[in-house]
């Protein structure tokens, strides 16, 4: 099992804290939060001597693939740079947000938004494949429900070459049935963003800080996606508490039968 720590709690200068993460755990970085020089310098530090793997979260700020107002040509340029990062530093996957909130411009149609999101996702996936990059489609946290569970699975599920990262916190927030999601997508789920919440917001709590039955989750994980990477995407550190949460998580994993 690959366990990866997101650098979400350590954006910017504070990324140096990630050097304290034990070397067996990997790192997931947000590509848009640094230029090439920044990542050249920082990855030398945080990945030095590390057996854990690197993954990269693709750009998402001000990007909504479902919106007519999205400048998709600029999005493609941004992802080309990100795919270059993936290959330069041998990252195992790149994460894609396939849509944002429901656009607020007059005349937006939900069905057209789903179609636009799918078409653009497929184009980015083709670009990724041409570069030998594994692009993973993530479920979103927005409670205004541009895509609920049914729409997400109906829109992206039939495209058999697509691969997925399921964000547990986003699924919890929107009351998705995780057993149904995992049993539908199965081993096309290549990774998870692991975090929790109380249904009151996308708070990115650590395993053990929220109400989720993680033993039940790991029963489904073992049945349907046993090789998927676990990316701990927490809002806060410190590193020692993140590592402690891994111990809690693994207790649930071992208890899952």
What function would you assign to each model-found segment?
Residues 2, 14-20, 76, 92, ...:
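Histidine-acidic metal/acid-base catalytic patches
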Residues 60-64, 100-104, 196-202:
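Conserved radical SAM core fold
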Residues 1-87, 254-257:
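N-terminal pre-domain/capping segments
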Residues 46-61, 116-128, 156, 214-217:
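Alpha-helix-loop-beta-strand connector modules within alpha/beta enzyme cores
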Residues 7-17, 30-44, 63-73, 102-106, ...:
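Acidic-and-aromatic substrate-binding clefts and catalytic sites of carbohydrate-active enzymes
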Residues 19-21, 45-46, 85-88, 123-127, ...:
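Alpha-helical scaffold elements within enzyme catalytic domains, especially in hydrolases
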Residues 71-164:
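Active-site acidic/histidine proton-transfer and metal-coordination neighborhood
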Residues 2-7, 25-29, 54-58, 94-96, ...:
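Hydrophobic faces of well-ordered beta-strands that scaffold small-molecule active sites
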């Amino acid at each position: 099992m690959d366990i990866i720590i997101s650098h979400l709690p350590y954006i910017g200068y504070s990324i140096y804290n990630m050097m304290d993460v034990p070397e067996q755990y990997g790192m997931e970085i947000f590509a848009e939060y640094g230029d090439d020089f920044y990542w050249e310098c920082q990855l030398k530090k945080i990945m030095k001597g590390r057996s854990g793997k690197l993954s990269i979260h693709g750009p998402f700020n001000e990007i909504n693939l479902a919106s007519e107002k999205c400048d998709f040509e600029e999005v493609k340029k941004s992802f080309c740079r990100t795919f270059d990062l993936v290959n330069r530093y041998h990252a195992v996957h790149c994460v894609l947000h396939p849509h944002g909130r429901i656009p607020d411009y007059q005349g937006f149609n939900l069905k057209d938004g789903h179609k636009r999101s799918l078409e653009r996702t497929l184009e980015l996936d083709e670009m990724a494949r041409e570069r030998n990059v594994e692009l993973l489609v993530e479920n979103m946290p927005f409670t205004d429900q541009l895509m609920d569970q049914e729409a997400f699975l109906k829109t992206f599920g039939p495209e058999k070459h697509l691969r997925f990262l399921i964000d547990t916190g986003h699924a919890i927030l929107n009351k998705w049935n995780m057993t149904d999601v995992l049993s539908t997508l199965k081993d096309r789920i290549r990774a998870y963003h692991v975090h929790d919440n109380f249904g009151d917001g996308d708070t990115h709590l650590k395993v053990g800080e929220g109400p989720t039955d993680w033993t039940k989750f790991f029963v489904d994980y073992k049945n349907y996606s046993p090789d998927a990477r676990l990316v701990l995407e927490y809002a806060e550190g410190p590193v020692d508490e993140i590592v402690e949460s891994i111990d809690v998580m693994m207790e649930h994993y071992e208890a899952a039968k």
